Amino acid sequence: MKGTKLAVVVGMTVAAVSLAAPAQADDYDAPFNNTIHRFGIYGPQDYNAWLAKISCERLSRGVDGDAYKSATFLQRNLPRGTTQGQAFQFLGAAIDHYCPEHVGVLQRAGTR
């Protein structure tokens, strides 16, 4: 009987830990999603986080040579009606949250 109870407790613990891991992953993207909601940009949290991470990757690989090209890419992939200003806000939030090493891209855009 003790063996059965122990097995049940261990099984419940393993289940709780395995179910908690995805929740932590989602929590990492939630602050980014909350930030872009303040800019009036809505959509699925997973898509927005994915788009932000892709933007960072494009900056890292040199696909988008400057913030203007990156904002154009974002504006084309965000919901219809997204303004250029919102695309820049999204880019700023993406850089802040996912790739702060690219903050210079925004700083250079501000000196143009």
Curated annotation (Swiss-Prot):
Keyword line: Signal
Signal peptide: 1-25
Alphabetized InterPro entries for the sequence: DUF732
Superkingdom, natural source: Bacteria
GO CC field: extracellular region; peptidoglycan-based cell wall
Induction note: By salicylate. Part of the Rv0560c-Rv0559c operon. Operon induction is slow but is maintained for at least 2 weeks in aerobic culture in the presence of salicylate.
Keyword Signal among UniProt keywords: yes
Name of this chain's protein: Uncharacterized protein Rv0559c
Naturally occurring in which organism (per UniProt): Mycobacterium tuberculosis (strain ATCC 25618 / H37Rv)
High-level lineage: Bacteria, Bacillati, Actinomycetota, Actinomycetes, Mycobacteriales
